[in-house]
Amino acid sequence: MEKTSNTSKPLSRSEINKIIAVATGIKEKKIKEIFKYLNTLLLNELVSRSVCILPENLGKLRITIRNARYQKDMQTGEIRHIPPKPLVRYSPSKTIKETAAKVRWKYAD
């Protein structure tokens, strides 16, 4: 890896493509196509089955439905109905959870 996690900005898509291209010897354009196809595949899987397992032990995406609810407008006192809403939830894998637990936060004591 060229960049470390101590940088202030996260890696951009083009930087990720460059790093993968150098590491694998595949052209950046081909890597871009691979990611585009992977994106389409994951979206189709998510729509058709409501669950999508991400590759390389990254975790799982799933669609859940937020229940309908009532909300009171604090200014007018009017009670509004909020309909059910589909949400995409991400469940990280065990290795990601363990790695995140080891991260030293800059605001921690």
Curated annotation (Swiss-Prot):
Protein origin, superkingdom: Bacteria
SMART domains listed in its UniProt record: BHL
Pfam family, any one: Bac_DNA_binding
Single Gene Ontology MF annotation: DNA binding
Protein name per UniProt: Uncharacterized protein MG353
Coiled coil: none
